[in-house]
């Protein structure tokens, strides 16, 4: 919905259906993953997110196979801890990131124990992510602060939507993931 304005899950659509939608009110269609990789062709580093909906294991394996022949630099991230663990076990040379948020405060529809485990990053001892990308709104959550101190991962904020949020996030986070604006250049 964010990029194309239709209210349907990507996993519910065929590519034949998706290619009729346009991205962000432009004339650009939704590209296949291989098309994106061909256009980028290693010119810039990539953050590749493995979505947690659907068959995370199959998606993770397919993404890894595609990226095996990619000539550029990339890291992977996912909200699904076992996708991160899969990369730890099968592609340990790839930088891995655990995406997370406070599932309770964000009112995400999950079972209470899933919210508890994911909000508190309780599987990080298994997945050992290189970085934690955490919702910047909840940067003071105890479990996030504790994980940063115990495991010393890179500290990443998502998703910053304006200059004011950026300036505030820079006080806490090492790396910023931003969307929907272009940050002002630093002097």
Question: In which residue ranges do the predicted regions lie?
Answer:
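Metal-dependent phosphodiesterase/phospholipase catalytic core, i.e.
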Residues: 1-104, 125-129, 133-137
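C-terminal active-site rim and adjoining tail of enzyme catalytic domains
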Residues: 28, 107-187
């Amino acid at each position: 919905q964010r990029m194309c304005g239709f209210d349907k899950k990507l996993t519910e659509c065929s590519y034949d259906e998706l290619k009729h939608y346009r991205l962000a009110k432009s004339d650009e269609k939704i590209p296949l993953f291989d098309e994106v990789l061909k256009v980028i062709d290693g010119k810039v580093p990539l953050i590749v997110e493995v979505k947690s909906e659907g068959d995370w294991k199959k998606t993770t394996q397919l993404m890894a196979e595609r990226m095996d022949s990619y000539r550029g630099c990339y890291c992977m991230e996912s909200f699904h801890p076992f996708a991160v663990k899969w990369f730890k076990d099968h592609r340990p040379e790839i930088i891995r990131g655990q995406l997370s948020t406070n599932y309770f405060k964000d009112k995400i529809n999950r079972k209470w124990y899933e919210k508890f485990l994911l909000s508190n990053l309780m599987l990080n001892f298994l997945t050992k992510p290189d970085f934690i990308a955490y919702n910047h709104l909840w940067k003071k959550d105890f479990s996030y602060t504790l994980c940063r101190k115990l495991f010393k991962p890179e500290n990443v904020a998502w998703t910053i939507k304006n200059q004011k949020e950026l300036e505030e996030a820079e006080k806490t986070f090492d790396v910023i993931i931003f969307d929907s604006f272009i940050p002002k250049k630093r002097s």
